């Protein structure tokens, strides 16, 4: 039905400020996955899938925001859920990870946990989907490192790393190349990527919250949408250069 990845990255800006960012990327052979699966804040990231209960994701993030560890938060929700054997639930907080696949999930299903990320999927063509997704992300992770590719600098400076949203889409693409969701009879698909960070900018990147709710080519469509959003961000920064630091768009000539 679905495969997804949840990520935490800790990084330092060139000025020496420490920050965390969290992200989820997901795709499935059903429409509208972006309304159901990914839940992200500047404290954590959670994905809920297979027999979806959006309350698990929403309340999980609320608990994490309130200071609960992700494993305590999500396990408590599952303990109170009679349908837990049919759920997949995974996520990250500022310190730890958690991943759960109920025994009644549909084959092939499973999950992986890295030091600061989780991957889970069900109704897959095989375990290689999960492995490829995890390996593609891990190979390009920017964690415990200085990152110049944040905010406006990601599109206006010569930087070596890609924004997290793009790297999450690339991880989905790697899993999809291994077969992805096995239900080929379902042609209408969807995908989404959401990123939140403790770092703030006068103009926030629009590509950190993207959804394709109904398409036959979810990964390609999400990547194209990302590219357009990145270009639009760059164009906006160039067109209104100085306006946001000046404090008023009225000070920018048309």
Predicted features, each with a name:
Residues 1-254:
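N-terminal nucleophile
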């Amino acid at each position: 039905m679905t495969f997804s990845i949840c990520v935490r990255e800790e990084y330092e800006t060139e000025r020496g400020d420490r920050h965390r960012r969290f992200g989820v990327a997901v795709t499935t052979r059903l429409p509208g996955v972006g309304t159901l699966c990914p839940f992200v804040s500047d404290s954590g990231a959670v994905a809920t899938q297979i027999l979806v209960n959006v309350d698990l994701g929403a309340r999980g993030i609320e608990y994490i925001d309130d200071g609960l560890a992700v494993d305590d938060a999500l396990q408590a929700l599952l303990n109170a859920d009679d349908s837990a054997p049919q759920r997949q639930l995974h996520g990250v907080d500022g310190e730890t990870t958690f991943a759960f696949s109920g025994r009644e999930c549909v084959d092939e299903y499973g999950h992986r946990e890295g030091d600061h990320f989780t991957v889970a999927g069900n109704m897959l063509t095989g375990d290689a989907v999960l492995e490829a997704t995890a390996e593609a992300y891990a190979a390009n992770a920017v964690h415990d490192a200085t990152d110049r590719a944040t905010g406006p600098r990601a599109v206006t400076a010569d930087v070596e790393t890609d924004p997290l949203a793009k790297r999450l889409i690339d991880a989905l693409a790697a899993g999809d190349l291994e077969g992805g969701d096995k239900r080929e009879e379902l042609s209408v698909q969807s995908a989404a990527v959401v990123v939140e960070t403790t770092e703030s900018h006068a103009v926030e990147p629009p590509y950190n919250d993207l959804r394709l709710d109904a398409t036959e080519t979810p990964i390609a469509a999400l990547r194209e949408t990302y590219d357009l959003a990145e270009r639009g961000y760059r164009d906006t920064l160039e067109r209104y250069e100085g306006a946001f630091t000046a404090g008023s768009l009225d000070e920018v000539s048309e």
